[in-house]
Amino acid sequence: MKKIKTIVASVSLVIAGLLWLLTSPAQAATIKLTCSAKDTIGNAVKKLKPGDTLSVTGTCNENVAIPEETTRVVLDGQGKAAINGPDTSNPTIVVNGRGITIKGFTVTGGRDGIVVSRGGQAVIDSNTIQGTARFGVQVNQTSFAVIVNNTIQNNQGNGITIGGSSYAAIGFFTALDKTANPNTIQNNGQNGINVGRSSNARITGNTIRNNKLNGVMVNRASQADITSSTIDGNGMSGIDVSQNSGVQLGADKGTGIFESPNTTTTGNSQVGIRCTLNSSADGRLGTLNGKNGAKDFDSSCVDSLIEAPGV
């Protein structure tokens, strides 16, 4: 099987990144915050020290910026708090710091829901991210994110965008995981996931359905490893790979989350996987499908897929 070397390198980055994210000093504090016009997450973040957790309740009507100097902190909405970004020219949450965890919030409004940029590192866990003016989650400018256990839906653009030489682990924490921590990415106005501009992603165990364009688009000299995901009912193809890019759809054999192929139960509007403009696909086709068939490759593409469904 042809190997995608950038994916292997990216797995090492996942492990290294998580070691950074999970390292915290011994004297960590939990600070409680009930959002109000006076008591905001933005003000509280300025006072956090490495290892601290900000435990948030209520509805926070603000656009939150987590600056580069903020490291190794947790923002915890406990599954109840909401952050609504009133300024639609800026993200609801932007992360430039490292070792930042955002979990348990409903995130709405803003230009984008959560943006990790300028070398930021973040874990985005167990949030509902919806109703933004553009992307649900964006990772760009050589940044790194683990995106797990979220519902990302009803955003006007892509559910998740990875760009600018960045890397994302979508649906798992580390390459040692035996089970996925899946996201549901649905009903977004463009692609479910877009990996572009020389970026890499490993996408495992997610449900990616009913997005207006493709389930997953990989383009502009990018690579993605896409496995064990259900890719259903998208408005174009399940997976679209183009512009000198490549996808790896699991291994030739094996049943683990990183080896198993993807599935389609409700056909995508075009094909299961489409390939154009000097791109490639390797691994197992699984049951990826669309109303126009399983796949469509132009003459410039390299097709190394094993086509036996379900193997």
Residue ranges and their predicted role:
Residues 61-74, 83-121, 135-142, 162-165:
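Extracellular beta-strand-rich solenoid/capping regions of secreted or surface-exposed proteins
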Residues 105, 127, 132, 150, ...:
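Consensus "Asn ladder" position of solenoid repeat domains
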Residues 63, 90-94, 113-115, 135-136, ...:
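Structural detector of coil-to-beta-strand junctions
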Residues 33, 56, 66, 77, ...:
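Extracellular beta-strand solenoids
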Residues 30-57, 61-65:
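Acidic Gly/Asp/Thr-rich repetitive segments characteristic of extracellular carbohydrate-active
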Residues 1-12:
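Bacterial N-terminal signal peptides that target proteins for export
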Residues 16-25:
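C-terminal segment of classical bacterial N-terminal signal peptides
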Residues 74-77, 100-103, 121-125, 144-148, ...:
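All-beta strand scaffolds that present successive hydrophobic residues in beta-strands
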